Every structure is written in C-alpha cells, then in structure tokens.
Regions:
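Structured C-terminal helix/loop/strand segments within mature extracytoplasmic catalytic/sensor domains
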Residues: 18-26, 39, 125-126, 130-131, ...
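Conserved catalytic neighborhood of penicillin-recognizing serine enzymes
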Residues: 84-122
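Short, well-structured active-site flanking segments
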Residues: 64-84, 130, 184-188
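Acidic/histidine-rich, surface-exposed loop or edge segments in extracytoplasmic proteins
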Residues: 35-43, 89, 114, 246-249
Length: 275
C-alpha cells in the first residue's frame, strides 16, 4: 500500500499536466480522490456548482435538525401537490393528487436516492433554509461548501446555480467525515443506506469502480445548454472488498455525456492502484 501511495504521488504532477492538455475532453472539470487521508487530483481546489450534489450536505443538516428537535424519520408533513413545481425533475409528483402526508424518511429518500427537486425544497422549507445548511457546514469545519439557493430559485435562474458550490477536495473531506460518523445516530445511518441505494448516475462513477466494490454516492446534473452539453457531477465513497475505502469526487462544467465522469474516475482509480 505504501509503495502504491508513493507511486501515485510521484505521477500526480505528470498526470495533472496531461489532464490539463487533454484536448479530447470538452469539459472543464475538477476531480480528486482521497485514501488514507491523502488527496490527489486536478483542479481539486477550484469552485464548481454542486447542482444536486448539494442535497447531500442538505441531508446532513436535516439529520441534525431532526435530532436536535427530537423528531423522527417517521414524522410527517402534509404536502399539497398544487404547491409544488410541476416542470422539474420530481418523481414524487407521480405518487399522488391533491394532498398527501410524507414522512421525513420518504422526503430524504426522494431527495437523495432519486434527486427529487421538490423533495429537496420541502426539506428546505421545514428543516432549514439554504443558509442553515451552510451554517451547519461551517459548524462541522467545512468552509468551501456554499449553499445559497433552493431548487426553485435555481430553476427560475439557472445562472444562479454556481451559488451552491464546493471544491472537489472539500466534498471528499465531507464524505470522509460522513464515513466516520454514519453510525452516530439513526438519521445518518438512514442517509448512508439511501445513498448506497442511489438510483441515479449509474453510468458515472459506479461504471468505473471495480466489479467487487460498492459505492455510496450523490450525483448532480446542470441545465442543458443549446449545444447539448451540461454540468455533470458525482461524488461518493468507494467500499473495497478488503474493507478499505476511497472517496472520489468529479465535477464538470459542460460535459457531453455521463461517460466522461466514468472516464475521469477511472483515471483516478488507476493512479491510485484501485483497478
């Protein structure tokens, strides 16, 4: 393992230069991998719009809110379908007409597991606005994760998406924190299970991991441009069969396809000897 780590660090600067000069890639991107507290990457300290990756730090804030207020995952809120955005990605819209009671567990599963934008905004409404999420990130010690906008606000003005931003390096550090705290309480354990069962982005980092590995992750996708490209992100925890883990984050600004995320992640794994 020590030899692998040393080799990875030696080739990092050469790999980074090659990545910068890679004219075959259409996307501007930042990516990094953390293993054994060591981070290597390219543009890992640059800011990128999180898009729906934002729903991960939001979920951590929701867990803190529920815990502090003595509330359970099975507590409910009544949702009126007429109050929800109708022209956004929202699987929950197909579940009901009129009014329906949703548990916080259901809203977290919709937001994290299916990236439902209405579910995310309901969590903002009942468990703390964007500024509460950012404040919680600061409390945990993460200063390069910024949350200022709801999904509805970004939907109205897509250029505002950058106001929910992070650096790839800070996101892997937050995921590392989560890895070590996932069993602290039932809320975090539920978030872990939900992200492990995530149904989005299967052609992104999941397509690049070793066949025997598992992933706990959250994806994000921006608004498509007239040219047919869009920001695509993925960040997650890779669980290796030997019991070890690695944290990976890939953020792009105008990716032509999900396969680009897998390609970048595959390079990271190869440099770290995970393939």
């Amino acid at each position: 393992m020590i030899v692998t780590l040393v080799c990875a660090l030696i080739v990092t600067s050469c790999w980074a230069q090659n990545a910068i000069n890679d004219s075959t890639r259409l996307s501007s991107y930042g990516a990094c991998i953390m293993r054994n507290d060591s981070i290597i990457g390219i543009n890992e300290n640059e800011r990128f719009a999180m898009h729906s990756v934002m729903k991960f730090p939001q979920a951590l804030c929701v867990a803190d809110y529920l815990s502090r207020n003595g509330m359970g995952l099975d507590d409910t809120i009544v949702v009126d379908k007429a109050d929800l955005m109708q022209d956004t990605w929202s699987p929950m819209l197909k579940r009901f007409e009129g009014e329906k009671a949703f548990t916080y567990a259901e809203l977290l599963e919709l937001s994290l597991g299916q990236s439902d934008n209405n579910a995310s905004d309901l969590l903002f409404k009942y468990c703390g606005k964007p500024k509460a999420v950012e404040k919680y990130m600061r409390k945990l010690g993460f200063h390069d994760i910024h949350v200022h906008m709801t999904e509805k606000q970004m939907h109205k003005n897509p250029t505002k998406s950058i106001e929910n931003s992070c650096t790839p390096a800070e996101m892997v550090r937050l995921l590392e924190w989560f890895y070590h705290h996932k069993d602290d309480n039932p809320y975090l354990a539920f978030i872990w299970k939900t992200m492990a069962d995530c149904s989005t982005g299967l052609k992104r980092i999941p397509a690049a991991i070793p066949a025997s590995a598992r992933i706990v992750h959250k994806t994000g996708t921006g608004f498509p441009s007239p040219e047919g490209v869009q920001a695509m992100n993925d960040a997650g925890i890779i669980l290796m069969p030997d019991g070890s883990h690695a944290i990976v984050a890939v953020f792009t600004t105008h990716s032509p396809s999900e396969a680009e995320i897998a390609s970048i992640a595959r390079e990271l794994f190869e440099k770290y000897g995970l393939r």
